[in-house]
Every structure is written in C-alpha cells, then in structure tokens.
Swiss-Prot record:
Family label: Belongs to the TrhO family.
Secretion signal span: none
The Rhodanese domain, residue ranges: 121-215
GO molecular function annotation: oxidoreductase activity, acting on paired donors, with incorporation or reduction of molecular oxygen
Reactions accelerated catalytically: uridine(34) in tRNA + AH2 + O2 = 5-hydroxyuridine(34) in tRNA + A + H2O
Keywords: Oxidoreductase, tRNA processing
Pfam families linked to this entry: Rhodanese (PF00581), UPF0176_N (PF17773)
Name the UniProt record assigns to this protein: tRNA uridine(34) hydroxylase
Catalytic residues as annotated in Swiss-Prot or TrEMBL: C175
EC number: 1.14.-.-
SUPFAM superfamilies per UniProt: Rhodanese/Cell cycle control phosphatase
Length: 296
C-alpha cells in the first residue's frame, strides 16, 4: 500500500534553490515520487511512497527553517501515483501574481468541515470556489459560485469585475487542500472585505470527515496525481486524465470520436493544431515503448 501526501507551508526561504539537492536526494533514496515546489514563499506539492519513505521526507521538510507547522493530507493507494520525483524552483508555490499577497501576515477565518454546512447555508454568505474551471466541472459544493477561471492567477481580475455582487456579504471560500484559499482570503482582506472564511483542510478534509448522507458536496474532487479524482471517504473516483490537455474525462468519453490516447479528447480536440497532435502522438509512442521495455 502506498501513502499519498499532499502538503504545503508558507514560510520564508532566502535561497530555495539551495534546499533542492538534499531534498531530491532523500526522496530518491526513499523511493518517494511526485512533485515538490520550492519558492521564496515556501513549499507545496504531492508525493507518494511507502510509510517509512513519506515519514522521512515529511521529517526533512518539517526541519527546514520555519516549517515546523507544515500542513499535509494523507490518503492510501494500491499503486504509486507518480512515475518519478521532481523538485522544482518557482517564483510562487501557488501562482497568483499578486506580490503584496502574504498569507503569513493574515488569512480568513478557518472553518472546520464540521461547521462548514451551517456557514454556507446562511443567506448572507456567498460561497466561492477558487479552483480552475475544469476542476469545478466535475464537482463542487451546492450553491457555490464558479468564477470560471482557467488558472488561479485569473482570480484577482474576476474579483475586481464581480466584487459589486458581494456588497454586505460574508465570503466563504474553498479549494482542494487549502493552499489557494490561504492566498485568496489574504487578497480579499487586502481589498477591504471584512468577513472572509475558508474551509480548513479544503475539500479533501471535508470529504474525509463528513459522511455522504450529511454532505453538501456534489460530484468528485479533482486531484493532481494518477487517481485524477476522489469522492467521499477519499475513495478513488471514476475519472481518467486526457494527457493532451490534462483535464479529467470519464471512461465513456474514450469511446467518442475525438478521443485518442495521449493526444486528444472531446474537450481539447478543437483546441490543438495538427502539429500539436503529431507531437503528442510521438510522445505517446515513446511512453508505450518505455512501458514495453519495462515489461521485458
């Protein structure tokens, strides 16, 4: 059984690139795979491996300067959910492109999953999903507003264009594991919004804690590993990933004329050029050759 750990922490790294070699070496030595992002504002990522391997990496991360409060969520899987280990150096651990946003200074009020349903049922509360459009498409909370953003960096512009809709409203925000809400609630507070709340632990914590018969969540939650989606109890969902556009699809979608493994699906067929598709076919060919060599 493999452990999947989704983690993040906002802190100040003076030289994140200097942290990469030892972290990458440890992950490889422990057989841990996945992706970790290091930036001046902290660390973010998802990794998978054995219990001992994950514990070793988490201990290493918690020992980094200012990281003793590292947040992570765990789930179990019968397979490794990443092919290799990557440690990347970025400007931000979650890209918002708002240099004045700093979750270390202040964030919205945390709301536990146990209290979330009561909060979002209040008539003076506006519930905003801060995730990308393709994530919202497969699942969200009842009555939640979908900003229809293609990336988190589009959220500030959406808020600026729509903030008049929320005059005298309390704002409740949610995302997959909590990291985007750390930034979005700080951003709204900086814009003068007084009552800002966010779901502690994100959707993943809610799906783990709240029984389905008491839940206001509809659908599945997109996750950034080979599970693609999860439902209540963090059970693996039905979705697959189109490797042409990295968006979730259902098994039935593979029967559509637009689907070609590793190349396209009905969501992206008209969005890519013939040159793109040729490049994706070559990539898929190399993947299949690598699989054959691994089985030989």
């Amino acid at each position: 059984m493999f452990i999947i750990a989704a983690l993040y922490h906002f802190t100040r790294f003076e030289n994140p690139a200097a942290l990469k070699p030892a972290l990458l070496e440890l992950c490889k030595a422990q057989g841990v795979t996945g992706t970790l992002l290091l930036a001046p504002e902290g660390v973010n990522g998802t990794i998978t491996g054995s219990r001992a391997g994950i514990d070793a990496v988490l201990a290493h991360l918690k020992a980094l300067p200012g990281c003793d409060g590292l947040e992570w969520k765990e789930a179990q899987s019968e397979r490794a959910n990443f092919g290799k280990m990557k440690v990347r150096i970025k400007r931000e651990i979650v890209t918002m492109k708002q240099p004045d946003v700093d979750p270390r200074a202040k964030t919205g009020h945390y709301v536990t999953p146990a209290d979330w349903n009561a909060l979002i049922a209040q008539p003076d509360v506006a519930v905003i999903d801060t995730r990308n459009d393709y994530e919202v498409e497969i699942g969200t909370f009842e009555g939640a507003i979908d900003p229809k953003t293609r990336s988190f960096g589009e959220f500030p512009a959406w808020w600026e264009a729509n903030k008049h809709r929320f005059h005298n409203k309390k704002i409740a925000m949610f995302c997959t594991g909590g990291i985007r809400c750390e930034k979005s609630t700080n951003y709204l507070l900086g814009q003068g919004v007084e009552d800002v709340f966010h779901l502690k632990g994100g959707i993943l914590q809610y799906l783990e804690d709240i029984p389905q018969d008491q839940s206001t969540w509809n659908g599945a939650c997109f996750v950034f590993d080979n599970r693609v989606s999860v439902g209540h109890g963090l059970q693996e969902g039905p979705h697959l990933l189109c490797h042409g556009c990295r968006q979730p699809i259902l098994p039935a979608d593979k029967k559509r004329a637009e689907y070609e493994e590793g190349v396209s699906c009905h969501k992206c067929f008209d969005q890519t050029t013939s040159e793109d598709k040729a490049r994706f076919r070559e990539r898929q060919k190399q993947i299949e050759l690598a699989r054959k060599r691994a089985r030989a």
